[in-house]
Each structure stands twice: as structure tokens, then as C-alpha cells.
């Protein structure tokens, strides 16, 4: 079940490969995510010391969050992947033009997972082409409905 999608990622990047990663979360973050108070549109993934981190994802704390814990909505969160997957991603990201972007948050067997994509940035003309294709698909569907 999907919690949050990053629709902007598909507009700004060509996503070539997808990986499912676990996220190291605190208790208040899990509760807030279950309440749907998460946004990953501004998030991105960085590699530091052979580890992946999700930066810029915003999880709004609930009013009932603990008083002895100071919730930080945009803290850096560690992503959990197998070592060989991380090595593969490091090799790809070091190539020119590749980056890692969060695509969505979802539940897998009761755990919150983050799907990350190995992506290449789109140029402005690529974005325009994508928009034209989407508009044409919408127009085509409308015409087919009118015929039927």
C-alpha cells in the first residue's frame, strides 16, 4: 500500500532502475507516517561513507509526540540496503549524470519501505516532450470516449 508518491521525480528524471530500501525511523516518525503526514517531493538520496541517506523528506510530527524527544521533521534518515546493492549504486552514481531519487514510500509486510530510483536528469526539452505525450494520451482517451 502506497503512503506517499514523488510524482515530481518522474517529471524531472528518467528513472532507469528501482530499488526497495528500508528506512531507519524513530517511533514518532512511524506514527506520523501511518497518519499520512509525510512528503518526499523535496527529498533526495546521498551516499556518505558507503551508506545511503534520505535528505529533505518531511515528516510532520503529531501533536501527541513525546515531550522528552524533540521531533525534527526534516532530519537525515538512513536507508537500509544490502551491501552489494549499495556498491552497485555507488558505481552507477559515480558515472556522469546519474542520481538517486526517492520515488515512493509504501508498506511491505508491516514495515515502511522507500523505493529509490537510479535516474538521469531530464533537460527542459525532454520535460516538454513528456508533457506533450501526456496531453496527447489524455486527448486520445477523450476522443475514444466520445466515439463510443
From Swiss-Prot:
Keyword RNA-binding: yes
Alphabetical UniProt keywords: Cytoplasm, RNA-binding
Location(s) in or outside the cell: Cytoplasm
Superkingdom of source: Bacteria
CDD domains hit by this protein: SmpB
Pfam families in UniProt: SmpB (PF01668)
GO molecular function: RNA binding
GO cellular component assignments: cytosol
A single BP term in Gene Ontology: trans-translation
Region (Disordered): 129-148
Task of the protein: Required for rescue of stalled ribosomes mediated by trans-translation. Binds to transfer-messenger RNA (tmRNA), required for stable association of tmRNA with ribosomes. tmRNA and SmpB together mimic tRNA shape, replacing the anticodon stem-loop with SmpB. tmRNA is encoded by the ssrA gene; the 2 termini fold to resemble tRNA(Ala) and it encodes a 'tag peptide', a short internal open reading frame. During trans-translation Ala-aminoacylated tmRNA acts like a tRNA, entering the A-site of stalled ribosomes, displacing the stalled mRNA.
Family indicated by similarity: Belongs to the SmpB family.
PANTHER family on file: SSRA-BINDING PROTEIN, TMRNA-BINDING COMPONENT OF TRANS-TRANSLATION TAGGING COMPLEX
Protein's recorded name: SsrA-binding protein
